[in-house]
Amino acid sequence: MKQQKVAFVCLHGSAKSLIAAQSFNRIAVQRNLPFRATTSGPEPDAQVAGNVVAGFKGRGIDVAQYKPTLVAADQLADADLIVSFACDAGRRFAPGKPEERWDECPAVSDDFDVAWGFITGRVEKLVARLAATRSLP
């Protein structure tokens, strides 16, 4: 089966979309699913914020060297599904591409643990839904 791609996009590509993509990829590998995720943002930070690095580290994941990337039209065109956090990535860069908006996600800067719980809970449901159909929209 062809590997299918989910593009997670948040404004800075360094917190919400990073949590989502890391979680999504971990679950997909654990369950041997043909899905992979990317992370990016239209205004990428130069580096991952300290509270995000610390939050990941507390969960045994090292993102200290991760460099946020600029969202690109070809990256989104290659995705089977776009999941955006409070930015119009799909509409701006890949009109007509299936997109889910998770705009109500709590700010990672306010409380990493609350945002982590929200995002990973949504990712679990997304993976379960995709696994049930074995394809993306």
Regions found by a protein language model. Give the residues of each.
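Phosphate-binding/catalytic loops
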Residues: L81, C87-P137
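Conserved active-site segments centered on acidic
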Residues: M1-A72
